[in-house]
């Protein structure tokens, strides 16, 4: 239904009904709306408008004697056409992410876990963040260190400050190198590789101009190239088959989860192999904005009484992972959308820097 088919008064009353139910989890009547939301019209006028909204499928009465609550259609129209994200909470989310994960000098898992914890804490809902899909790490720093007369340690640090190393054995013809000569050659090789590989993946090895090093370094270069290729095979990108989940306790405090059977179904979904949740979170990677799916729009029975708010975080403008919140359909959508948007934006910047 288009919001243009509603009068301004009906839009205001629908918005007030949604806000009331989100806040209280209780149906609301016309008298309460008139008294609590300053609508400047009589309870009778509000009652008539609520009747119109009910006939339009936007509100319903859970019990004959009760007030009204929003339907899924009412939430959908509210989210799509009446709601504005809470920009103050968006700024607060950005600030907490920047302050609590200040220099980003941590592993990728620590970065994502910290972001998931902050998102859950600020929203009060269940946060879920996937690991990046097919993300190739980039070289941040490379160093060669002589640790014995015949052995060199190759150390590579990636853009998530994770470290891998390989022990290289010098060929027979180099065993008589004096320590200072070997150190000089290792420094030249380290400088060459940092210049050529910094900010690039190890796959860029195939395009390196090794002959430019000169004949003096070619024997070392061959050993080094093999060591780097071995590291590349060992250091594969993290697949997006891992899901970080935070905030379950907060979600289960919501009155919608007071039935043991429903809680058990949700726990089984979260504790399983995640093969059901991941496709849902990673669907439609072309989307460049926050997506809200409500109730029956979700195909999984354990969360069919919930809403899923999700957005992609990107690298080089390509979606690589998902940031999501799961909460009851009676969700504070203004907050959820703002917090998810801020977190996805932060992660995009973090993995790009």
Curated annotation (Swiss-Prot):
<comment type="similarity">
    <text>Belongs to the HrcA family.</text>
</comment>
<keyword id="KW-0805">Transcription regulation</keyword>
<dbReference type="InterPro" id="IPR021153">
    <property type="entry name" value="HrcA_C"/>
</dbReference>
<dbReference type="InterPro" id="IPR029016">
    <property type="entry name" value="GAF-like_dom_sf"/>
</dbReference>
<dbReference type="InterPro" id="IPR036390">
    <property type="entry name" value="WH_DNA-bd_sf"/>
</dbReference>
<dbReference type="GO" id="GO:0003677">
    <property type="term" value="F:DNA binding"/>
</dbReference>
<dbReference type="GO" id="GO:0045892">
    <property type="term" value="P:negative regulation of DNA-templated transcription"/>
</dbReference>
<keyword id="KW-0346">Stress response</keyword>
<comment type="function">
    <text>Negative regulator of class I heat shock genes (grpE-dnaK-dnaJ and groELS operons). Prevents heat-shock induction of these operons.</text>
</comment>
<dbReference type="Pfam" id="PF01628">
    <property type="entry name" value="HrcA"/>
</dbReference>
<keyword id="KW-0678">Repressor</keyword>
<dbReference type="InterPro" id="IPR036388">
    <property type="entry name" value="WH-like_DNA-bd_sf"/>
</dbReference>
<protein>
    <recommendedName>
        <fullName>Heat-inducible transcription repressor HrcA</fullName>
    </recommendedName>
</protein>
<dbReference type="InterPro" id="IPR023120">
    <property type="entry name" value="WHTH_transcript_rep_HrcA_IDD"/>
</dbReference>
<keyword id="KW-0804">Transcription</keyword>
<dbReference type="InterPro" id="IPR002571">
    <property type="entry name" value="HrcA"/>
</dbReference>
